[in-house]
Amino acid sequence: MRLVLRLAGAGLTAAMAAIHLSLWDDGYRDLDTIGPLFLLNGVVGILLALALLVTPVRLLGPVAAVTALFTAGTLGALFLSLTTGLFGFDESLDADLVRPTLYVETAGVLVLTILAVTAFSHRRRPRR
């Protein structure tokens, strides 16, 4: 089960990174503050996806937790940009990739949180 969660979490994190890099390449790079943040999100997302795949089981809990928090922060930033605006940028629900991003990031937060909880609970089990 943990392998499935690990692969799903890495895949969702990589998808989130790919979306941000694609949007950055499609013109978001020209936006003050938002542009560099999209690039940073894409690069960090790739690194976290790779970390989820190669991290030993004993360290998986912290890596999954950090990735879940990163994804939740990204999702929160999207909600802000859809409602009040973020750094002077207002996003529309009808804009390219907004809905897929909402789905990917929401699923990512759920999967990564479950992975972190199961990984931490596995670490705390007494050995027989």
PLM ranges: what are they?
Residues 1-128:
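Membrane-interface extramembranous regions
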